Amino acid sequence: MAKIRIFELARSLNMTNPDLLDRLKEMGIEAKSHLSSLEDDIVEKVRQGVFRTEVEKPEKVEQKRVRSNVIRKRRQPVKSEAEPEAEAPAAQAPEAEEVTAPTAEEAVPEEAADADVSAKAETPTAPETPEEAEISVSEEAPVEEAADQVPPTDEAVDPAEAAPAEEESSPSRKKAKAKKHQAAKIIKFPDAPQRLSNKGVLEVVDDTAPADSPAAPAAATPAGEKDKKPSRKDRKKRGKTESVETEEAVPVKKKGVFKRKEIVEGVALYDRTRGRMRKKGKGGAKVPGGAKTQITTPKAIKRKVRINESISVAELAKRMGVKASEVIARLMGMGVMATLNQQVDFDSAALVAAEFEYEVEKASATEEELLELNVEEDQGNLKKRAPVVTIMGHVDHGKTSLLDVIRQSRITEGEAGGITQHIGAYKVNTANGEVVFLDTPGHEAFTAMRARGARATDIVILVVAADDGIMPQTIEAINHSRAAGVPIVVAVNKIDKEGADPDRVKREASDHGLVPEDWGGDTMFVNVSAKQKLGISDLLDMVLLQAEMLELKANPDKKARGVVIEAKLDPGRGPVATVLIHEGTLSVGETVVCGIHYGKIRAMFDDKGAPLDQAGPATPVELIGLGGVATSGDDLFAVGDEKSAKTVSENRQQKQRTEDLARKDSISLENFFEKMQEKEEKVLNIIIKADVNGSCEAIADSLQKFSSGEVKIHVVHSAPGTIIESDVTLASASNAIVLGFNVRPSPKVRALAAEENVDIRSYDIIYDLIDDIKKALTGMMSSTFEEEVLGRAEVRELFVIPKKGTIAGSYVLDGKIERGRPARLLRDGVIAYNGVIGSLRRHKDDAKEVASGYECGIGIENYNDIKPGDVIECYFLREIKPEL
């Protein structure tokens, strides 16, 4: 069922929101605010209730003059039919009352309203007396009243004050008073307060009925008075029955301007503008009670806040026009502890804004719309692309050597220690087509790199040495491939080596779910030798066969998308990213978004270093032009304009800042004791600088594994690039050591490090780096001690020797008693004293130790309270060095 909001219904009924809410309350309909929704049946009920015309019985109106230009009339209860009518027909008045028009200074404008108001003079249909003129009232159309309009307040009028007002029957006296104090009438409520002219005939039409409904017939009353139904505003004010009757100017003899009395009901007689103007005039009458201050409520269209993905608490409060403390209080009520400058997400901002009757909408398109993530692909535009193959396996099993043979290059010779410590992307032309290869590290420290390689690939070549079999990193590579849903081709390498056993590899692989095809499984096994260049063509044929089964296709005519394989900071070229294009075509000069960074591509190079203008699907490229060093594994998107790229980048940066602030440790009453205990821990602060971003990530992850309950590694800073002076300054301030991987500091940086007493360590092989940090952490840890009991002796007799104290004549029960060892005195199985054996004698000779079955004299240092029957237990503490 369709619904309509209250502010929309009020607009269609030409009413203000507060009036309609009051009307709904009178009708028994609950509504919290003008943003609430109503069902269709309730809306129809409200429309009928608003437009229904009620005809009441005429009531006698008693007029009282309060001021010279205001007459109050009080409705009297209708008399019963039994009472005789006391009033006789009034004689016809000779003519209407005459007053002169007020001066411009005395004219008082009314405040703005949305409906036009006009008055129409009616010809008297009944005889008039000189004291009372016939008053005609037309139905009042509903209008939106100004927010700060104040309803007239009732005044208690004494009979003594009312009597003189009724006795004023002389037209001359009325003329004099009207000339002095009469104010001009309003013919229209403008949108803004303005001064109205007092010239001409001003007429007022009552606006309590809809404009399209016919006016109710006026019933003639005694003395020419006409009955008037109480307005909705009067009913709201506790059923007040007083109405205000103002005097209009009657014909002025000089200018021929005719004015008459008319009832003005439901309109405020005082507002801010009118009050200010009356203070200027000397004869202006004061309104009793003054003006009531009301808070201006913005229109519904203005009660909206447009934000991006997040907004600060201070900015949200500013846009809603409320105090920031109130917004923080509402957030605390929702369980969100936020400060003035802290960012809140879109959902939290929407909930808080709803508390203040505001709506929240997104100011810009979403990231999915800007990056066109949900655009459906036309299958007719897809074309065949080259497969992406990742080579994975245990360290030193021959992965890079195998790739060397395929590429006919010598990569291994350039690797430090003969092991791969980066992820590389290469495109190879074979006899059967192009193949893109990704070479991943095999060391355990590069787990994240292998995971990224598995996610970015179509096929995995799992290299296993025939003489080693399945190793820990081999199992990890299998798990990464399964998690990515990528098919595996097993390459059994080093088959030419002595002790090679390909069948052993098949058996161990079968235990992990890789069953060979010749054993009834679905996994391809190929025997190869990178050193002897055996089986390479068979391996490529298997890879291309697997690729044909996958039917790999991509659309080269759309905006490019890719993934960052590796990123680094080049001193001469700036941020450099190795990207594998998945789909679309990337061109030089295009604007791209990559993680939290964006930029315009200035140059592209292939895996051999040749410049490129365009790169199609399944093409590894090295691009320059990003605003910062991208994170390995980030997705790259080509966008149409720089503005969209900047919007996406700023939103992502804001999210990252919010997450970083949330991760920062803060002290509270709940975690105070825990933080105090952490301060007692030994912390090794480290700054990591490497040649590429992936190496920084791998080193940081490996070192974090060494943290224990006693020692902890804190990575203060980690970034790609060479070691610079700011790194040394940061290390000096944070008491950290600087670890460089494949980078070297300049002589100037070394001099600064020596001056600041900062330790800089440079490594080329990750083995050495991890071992050194492990030794450093071990040295920081405290040793533990284990108690070992040497022997026990029973006290049988006591000897007191001057200057020596009490000597216990004892019998060694088991083990041995050694001089200088710690000992404890046991009495009835309870420890009576802990000390050290100070003296040990056997047959008047000092002894170093006494074995079991022998008698001896034992003296305990600084203790003489020994009794026969006590047991002396000798022991020592064995030191156990910590290990990580």
From Swiss-Prot:
PROSITE patterns membership: G_TR_2, IF2
Region feature G4, mapped onto this chain: 493-496
GO MF terms held by the record: GTP binding; GTPase activity; translation initiation factor activity
Region called G1, residue ranges: 393-400
One GO CC annotation: cytosol
Location in or out of the cell: Cytoplasm
Region annotated G2, chain positions: 418-422
Bias kind Basic residues: ranges: 66-77, 172-183, 229-239
Subcellular location, principal: cytoplasm
Compositional bias ranges of the Low complexity kind: 87-106, 207-223
PANTHER family: TR-TYPE G DOMAIN-CONTAINING PROTEIN (PTHR43381:SF5), TRANSLATION INITIATION FACTOR IF-2-RELATED (PTHR43381)
Name the record gives this protein: Translation initiation factor IF-2
Gene responsible for this protein: infB
